């Protein structure tokens, strides 16, 4: 059979797209892109063009049908809308690990939960120990938060040498930490939850369960139920990105059942496709049916959770997370007067609680749980890894800034708290990277020394 030679331009295009695809799946690169976006936001927000930065993210964006219209700022749609997809991917990863990975054991799943509680309690107590004025004591929850996107991005800078279970442990801990932070916001910084929203969310969840029961595998069918879950959680007053976590945890971890094994179906449809392609009077329309069935069999070969993660990963890593960083990392430092005693202590307390309180709480509680025999360290995780996770958990960034906006009324204290969060996040990132590099080198040296020559 004569081999068809592809045009040179098409060869170059295919090679370029293949290289681009490999590039997009390198997590270290996604971490660099994320940090570049954060630095750009900080420079922009403190430059002569700062007004344009604020104006851009406050631009209203409206969705609606007929008289039913919902309008919010671009900043809202990024933080509460797009980031739901990030949390969806996080929920899927946690679901996989609970099913067959590092969190599949109850004793192992308990450890990140306990560590997260320690990582919330110790920073809060450390902040309060600075003896603030009563108004500034309201900021106790600012250092309890962990910015998942930034912490995972910094961890990605250490590359593939870091065991995957360390990333899973950080994700599990940060998710629990974030849920605690959202509950703190709901119960301490708002008028409480509106329970009518839970009814709306329940309708969406029942629709998802119904679609799964009848074997619907197309992701598009779950967009509307997912949107209803998101809307319901939004109506409760809780952070709507929790909808992503819930839906991610509900994603099936086993492939959809078929009448025949997917590999057998792929072999049969491939043979049928080749037979029709070699027909002397070939009609392109004759190839559509076997191609469609072949794509369906290929799709069903993988569990939905694996398939969805692979599809969404590049969009989250190189689209959603950098946009999120650009929209949230731009904190204006003008007007922060640190000569006043109150703001001084707020900044110091927030910074110390994040940089020291987070690792202290996470490591100490983890050690205590393991020491008492209530938990075990997950596979491939040692105490150096726990310290690394503790240091990276000190990156409070956007979530801490969000809580600060709710906690402080005085502009001076608010500005000082933001400065403390930014300083602590930078220090925690540098300490985490330094510790991670040292840990990797120590492990490599120990491995080399122990290997036979």
Swiss-Prot record:
Catalytic activity: Na(+)(in) + 2 H(+)(out) = Na(+)(out) + 2 H(+)(in)
Disulfide bridge partners, by residue number: none
GO biological process, one term: regulation of pH
Keywords: Antiport, Cell inner membrane, Cell membrane, Ion transport, Membrane, Sodium, Sodium transport, Transmembrane, Transmembrane helix, Transport
Molecular function as annotated in GO: sodium:proton antiporter activity
Chief location: membrane
Parts of the chain that traverse the membrane: 23-43, 74-94, 111-131, 139-159, 168-188, 191-211, 214-234, 235-255, 316-336, 345-365, 386-406, 419-439
Cellular component annotations (GO), alphabetically ordered: plasma membrane
Subcellular location per the Swiss-Prot or TrEMBL entry: Cell inner membrane
Pfam families, alphabetized: Na_H_antiport_1 (PF06965)
Membrane topology per record: Multi-pass membrane protein
Gene3D superfamilies: Na+/H+ antiporter like domain
Highest taxon above the source species: Bacteria
Function: Na(+)/H(+) antiporter that extrudes sodium in exchange for external protons.
Family: Belongs to the NhaA Na(+)/H(+) (TC 2.A.33) antiporter family.
Cross-referenced HAMAP family: NhaA
Protein name as it appears in the record: Na(+)/H(+) antiporter NhaA 2
């Amino acid at each position: 059979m004569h081999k068809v030679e592809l045009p040179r331009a098409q060869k170059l295009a295919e090679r370029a797209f293949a290289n681009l695809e490999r590039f997009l799946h390198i997590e270290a690169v996604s971490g660099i892109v994320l940090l570049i976006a954060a630095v750009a936001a900080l420079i922009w927000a403190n430059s002569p063009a700062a007004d344009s930065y604020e104006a851009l993210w406050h631009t209203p964006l409206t969705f609606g049908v007929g008289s039913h219209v919902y309008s919010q700022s671009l900043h809202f749609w990024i933080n509460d809308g797009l980031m739901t997809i990030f949390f969806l991917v996080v929920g899927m990863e946690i679901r996989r690990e609970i099913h067959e990975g590092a969190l599949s054991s109850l004793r192992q799943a308990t450890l990140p939960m306990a560590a997260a509680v320690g990582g919330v309690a110790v920073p809060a107590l450390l902040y309060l120990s600075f003896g603030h004025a009563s108004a500034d004591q309201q900021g106790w929850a600012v250092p309890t938060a962990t910015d998942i996107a930034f912490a995972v991005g910094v961890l990605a800078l250490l590359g593939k040498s870091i065991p995957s279970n360390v990333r899973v442990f950080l994700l599990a801990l940060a998710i629990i930490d974030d849920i605690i932070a959202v509950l703190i916001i709901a119960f301490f910084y708002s008028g409480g939850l509106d329970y009518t929203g839970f009814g709306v969310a329940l309708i969406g969840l029942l629709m998802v369960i119904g679609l799964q029961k009848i074997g619907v595998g197309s992701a598009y069918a779950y967009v509307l139920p997912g949107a209803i879950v998101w809307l319901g959680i939004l109506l409760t007053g809780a952070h709507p990105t929790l909808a992503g976590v819930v839906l991610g945890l509900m994603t099936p971890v086993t492939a959809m059942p078929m009448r025949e094994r997917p590999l057998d179906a792929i072999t049969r449809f491939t043979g049928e496709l080749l037979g029709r392609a070699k027909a002397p009077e070939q009609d392109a329309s004759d190839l559509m049916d076997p191609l469609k069935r072949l794509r369906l069999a290929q799709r069903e070969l993988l569990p939905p959770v694996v398939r969805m993660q692979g599809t969404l990963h590049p969009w989250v890593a190189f689209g959603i997370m950098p946009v999120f960083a650009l929209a949230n990392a731009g904190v204006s430092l003008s007007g922060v007067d640190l000569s006043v005693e109150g703001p001084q202590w707020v900044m110091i307390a927030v910074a110390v609680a994040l940089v020291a309180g987070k690792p202290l709480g996470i490591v100490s509680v983890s050690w205590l749980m393991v020491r008492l025999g209530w938990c075990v360290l997950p596979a491939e995780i040692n105490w150096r890894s726990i310290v690394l996770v503790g240091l990276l958990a000190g990156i409070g960034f956007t979530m801490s800034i969000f809580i600060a906006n709710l906690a402080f009324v005085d502009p001076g204290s608010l500005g000082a708290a933001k400065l403390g969060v930014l300083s602590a996040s930078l220090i925690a990132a540098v300490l985490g990277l330094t510790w991670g590099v040292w840990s990797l080198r120590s492990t490599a040296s120990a491995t080399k020394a122990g290997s036979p020559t």
